[in-house]
A protein has these predicted regions:
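Asp-box/WD-like beta-propeller blade repeats and closely related beta-sheet repeat scaffolds
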Residues: 120-162, 169-185
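Repeated scaffold domains used in trafficking and secretory/extracellular systems
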Residues: 31-40, 78-89, 133-143, 178-190, ...
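Short coil/turn segments that connect the beta-strands within blades of beta-propeller domains
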Residues: 45-47, 89-91, 147-149, 189-191, ...
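Short glycine/acidic-enriched loop and turn motifs that connect beta-strands
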Residues: 54-58, 99-104, 158-159, 199-202, ...
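A short beta-strand motif characteristic of beta-propeller blades
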Residues: 27-34, 68-76, 80-82, 121-133, ...
Length: 387
């Protein structure tokens, strides 16, 4: 009984004191509710764009980070399993994704959303044929034409084709069948693209001026898909296409004459101990100013390890065919490098769900050193930057 009375008295004292404090506060200050607001525009400056696919169902998102220190500046969101592209000026994001009745399954539609980057706002939507490939993101799955009039969208049902969207008209103008071929590599002039075929050749599609017609031409065999398969990831070096194989061989190709031709094949890891191979998804990052290729790598390479996180990034001199430097990195699955004389390298890691910034030192044979890191919120394999 005494214990119960003591508890009751303590409770009464606490209530009384709280009432006195509340009364005193009421006399001295007036409660002002907090006003929540949003910025009309992001802070100016160059950005890093990271596409976060949501493989657990629900919306994907593209996050915008400051290229200087990776401060999160903004984001836009779409449906599931998104693919993205960014305009050359960095002011527009094109996001293709799926919207399903049961989040990740059921009936649905595939939609192209076009966003204004400075304001993070949706400008327009275009419903696409319900055929878009729902695959781990790669830049080769969604590409702009050289003048950014057309957008090319990779389809797989599993039959493969490419949807051509006229961005000026805001509509789909044709679907180009490409059986047995996958990936989109736009020509540098006019309207058209090449694609990788399952027999080791490439097919180049040349489109008419209005995007509604096409002609195609197939190349000779470029690589052996059984003994030396190449990644979807690519970049351009002095007009040529660059691809890297699972076994770290660099394929340099020309598409200038309307058909893909081999220029050279260079084994990067030849003579290096440790059975090193390419690792990740976005594995081809070329710096134009210095003619240096950056590739994420890992030791003990074997079948099935090609998508694992990289422990090193190699800087490779394409002209002299020389390995310049091997830098330790943070379990990266994708990289991107800027084109300046003193480049910056960015990377993403699925394992840690982080995006990283690395400073590159041309005076130290293009060694990279971590300068910043930030959370990227989920499963990301692709990234790019803007001026």
């Amino acid at each position: 009984m005494a214990h119960k009375l003591s508890v009751a008295l303590c409770a009464a004292c606490l209530i009384g004191n709280a009432a006195l404090v509340g009364s005193a506060l009421g006399e001295d200050t007036e409660f002002v509710p907090e006003t929540v607001s949003t910025k009309e525009r992001m802070d100016p400056g160059p950005n890093v764009f990271v596409n976060m696919q949501n493989w657990r169902g629900g919306p994907s998102a593209v996050y915008f980070y400051s290229a200087d220190d990776l401060t999160l500046k903004g984001s836009v969101s779409g449906g599931a399993q998104s693919h993205f592209a960014v305009s050359k000026d960095g002011n527009t994001v094109y996001l293709v994704s799926g919207f399903y009745s049961r989040l990740a399954s059921g009936s649905g539609e595939h939609v192209l959303q076009i966003f204004d980057v400075p304001t993070n706002t949706l400008k327009t939507e275009i419903v696409l044929p319900f055929k878009v490939t729902q695959y781990t993101d790669d830049k080769a799955l969604l590409q702009l034409s050289a003048d950014e009039r057309f957008l090319y969208v990779q389809n797989a049902t599993p039959a493969t084709s490419v949807t051509v969207v006229d961005l000026e008209k805001g509509s789909v103008v044709q679907e180009v069948p490409s059986p047995g071929c996958f990936g989109i590599y736009p020509t540098l002039e006019g309207y058209g693209y090449s694609t990788i075929c399952n027999d080791g050749a490439f097919t180049t599609y040349s489109l008419g001026e209005d995007g509604t017609t096409f002609e195609s031409q197939k190349s000779d065999k470029i690589f052996d898909p059984d003994s030396d398969p190449i990644y979807l990831a690519s970049d351009r070096a002095k007009g040529d296409l660059l691809f890297v194989s699972y076994h770290a061989n660099v394929y340099r190709l020309s598409d200038r004459d309307g058909v893909v031709k081999s220029v050279s094949v260079t084994p990067m890891a030849e003579g290096v101990e440790g059975n090193w191979g390419t690792s990740g998804y976005s594995v081809v990052a070329y710096n134009d100013a210095n003619d240096v290729l950056f590739v994420p790598m890992a030791a003990d390479h074997h079948d099935g390890s090609h998508y694992h996180g990289a422990t090193e990034v190699w800087a490779y001199d394409l002209e002299n065919k020389a390995l310049l430097y091997r830098s330790n990195v943070d379990d990266l699955n994708g990289i991107h490098v800027t084109d300046g004389a003193v480049p910056t390298l960015y990377g993403v890691s699925i394992g840690s769900s982080k995006v990283f910034k690395y400073e590159v030192d041309p005076a130290a044979r293009f060694a990279v050193k971590k300068a910043a890191e930030q959370s990227d919120f989920g499963f990301a394999t692709t990234l790019t930057s803007s001026p």
